[in-house]
């Protein structure tokens, strides 16, 4: 994938700038309709964009923690640990016109891969963009498994590992083009 290319998401209803080399996981395996999932071509890094039902019973920082813990529960994490939670400046978001609240969270989850006994600490960076007028919580997740997950020898330097700034660019560039995706309002 070309660097700094605006890529359509959810059938063109959204678009965002994805990092260089991002592979659409839906080309490799089934992905739920409410998700867009991309993986790095060399590392085990991944980016997930999810449209979730608005969790109106939690507000502010508690909403970011709620979604982080929910991801851990779904993945069968043996432990979850929040490192930091910070509000995101709405003015920096392309979605500032429809996003009423935004949070970033960094944390670690101890997760075992499918068919493996040993759990590894995976660093997760999340952005929660709350769109109450669409009854939607938009959750973006950047999974950063341990660095030694795969070989990063000289032959693989053509696509360096993604950085937190790549994730931040994804979050800030995310744009809504077709609100009909959410159904009648």
From Swiss-Prot:
It is found in: Nucleus; Cytoplasm, Perinuclear region; Cytoplasm; Cell membrane. SUPFAM superfamilies: Mog1p/PsbP-like (SSF55724). InterPro entries: Mog1 (IPR007681), Mog1/PsbP_a/b/a-sand (IPR016123). It holds the Pfam family Mog1. Gene3D superfamilies: Mog1/PsbP, alpha/beta/alpha sandwich (3.40.1000.10). May regulate the intracellular trafficking of RAN. Promotes guanine nucleotide release from RAN and inhibits binding of new GTP by preventing the binding of the RAN guanine nucleotide exchange factor RCC1. Regulates the levels of GTP-bound RAN in the nucleus, and thereby plays a role in the regulation of RAN-dependent mitotic spindle dynamics. Enhances the expression of SCN5A at the cell membrane in cardiomyocytes. This is Ran guanine nucleotide release factor.
């Amino acid at each position: 994938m070309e660097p700094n290319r605006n890529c359509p998401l959810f059938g063109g209803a959204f678009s965002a700038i994805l990092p260089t080399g991002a592979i659409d996981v839906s080309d490799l395996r089934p992905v739920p309709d409410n998700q867009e999932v991309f993986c790095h071509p060399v590392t085990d890094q991944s980016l997930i964009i999810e449209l979730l039902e608005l969790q109106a019973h939690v507000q502010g920082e508690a909403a970011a923690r709620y979604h982080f813990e929910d991801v851990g529960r779904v993945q069968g994490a043996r432990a979850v640990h929040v490192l930091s939670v910070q509000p995101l400046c709405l003015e920096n978001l392309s979605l500032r016109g429809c996003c009423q609240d935004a949070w970033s969270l960094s944390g670690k989850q101890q997760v075992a891969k499918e068919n493996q006994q040993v759990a590894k600490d995976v660093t997760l960076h999340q952005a929660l963009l709350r769109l109450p007028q669409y009854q939607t919580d938009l959750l973006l997740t950047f999974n950063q498994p341990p660095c030694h997950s795969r070989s990063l020898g000289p032959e693989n330097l053509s696509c360096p590992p993604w950085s937190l700034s790549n994730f931040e660019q994804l979050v800030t560039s995310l744009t809504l083009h077709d609100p009909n995706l959410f159904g009648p309002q």
